[in-house]
Amino acid sequence: PPTDKAPARKGKRTVAGIHLSHPDRVLYPAPAITKETLAQFYESIADRMLPHIAGRPLMLLRCPNGVGSECFHQKHFRDYMPKGMHTVDIPEKSTVRKYAVIENVTGLVGLVQLGVLEFHIWGCREDEIEKPDRMIFDLDPGPNVPWAAVIECALTLRARLEALSLKTFVKT
């Protein structure tokens, strides 16, 4: 049966140049996925993931102690920024806020070190804040919504967008 404990492992504790504190901390309980395992996974898919998230302002879901513990959304950064990242100043009402932007795999793994479990990109690039080039429809079904209904919704949405000559693709 699945447990909340990951098997004890020796070995790599630095991933993409980022030292991982608590590398054996379980972030996802079943099956047990540790911070180190997640960092290694993102390092392995960085070439495919970075073209979609690098250079875009981010909103992050942070769960420093893993799923099931206290989580919070972070949009703004003031002081600490992991290597491989920078901030972009974006005006908001009467102030200017700093948003995180990933540059490379080091930044991606640096966010795992901070307990980031979800990356939500803006629909624009950091150098074209007022010119979105991407629109995302996030289909998060409620607990009582059957998967077949989600699929039907996605197919209907795709058909309507393509009728408007908009290119669509699935992103998970």
Regions found by a protein language model. Give the residues of each.
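Signature for HUH/AEP ssDNA processing cores
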Residues: 100, 105-172
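Active-site loop/lid in soluble adenylation, ligation, and acyl-transfer enzymes
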Residues: 11-133
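Intrinsically disordered, low-complexity regulatory tails
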Residues: 1-11
